[in-house]
Amino acid sequence: MKTKLTFILFFSLGFFFAQEKKDSIKPKYKYEPNLAIGVDVLNAALSAFSDRKLFQAHASTKVRRNISAVLDAGYDKNVYLKGGYDASAKGIFAKLGGFYMLSMDQENKDNGFYAGGKLGASFYEQEYKAVPIRAFGGADQYLQLPSSKQSSYWVEAMIGARVQLFKSNFYVDVNAQPRYLAYTSK
């Protein structure tokens, strides 16, 4: 009986001294400002040579180690002149979301591949100056519609890569953003 109690005593003391003393108060997450602001240079340059005028900027900040929040905002103006249609649309849009860094460069944590999602909204004005309709006897006629204000909402996935240009504060960011239209006003 004493042998059994002696073993229980030693094992109990062994478990007692083997425990790590952990601080019961967890440190709070402290946000450190790390805002990155970007401009869509490609579409802004193409706007000089086409009917579509698209100007877009974005801001992103690291929320946690691999997770970042992103906000995109811009202005889009487009003219459609095909198949007898004469239409134009112009307005603003905004997208809010986040992304996860899938792989990062060891030397620069901002370089790497990422994936994420966004919710988007657009508020625009559209006008149809000419809409082709088939008249009696096959004659061409055109219908004009008054301008109207519209809004659209969508869900967007994003996957891309970002690389720093040399040792500067500039980055090249290439991404694909497929969209799913959730709702549009009529």
Outline where the language-model segments fall.
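Outer-membrane beta-barrel transmembrane domain signature
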Residues: 118-186
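Short loop/turn motifs that connect adjacent beta-strands in outer-membrane beta-barrel proteins
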Residues: 20-33, 66, 103-112, 165-172
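Short glycine/proline- and aromatic-enriched beta-strand/turn motifs that initiate or cap beta-hairpins
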Residues: 19-62, 72
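Cleavable N-terminal export/targeting peptides
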Residues: 1-28
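Hydrophobic, lipid-facing positions within transmembrane beta-strands of outer-membrane proteins
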Residues: 35-37, 53-57, 92-96, 113-115, ...
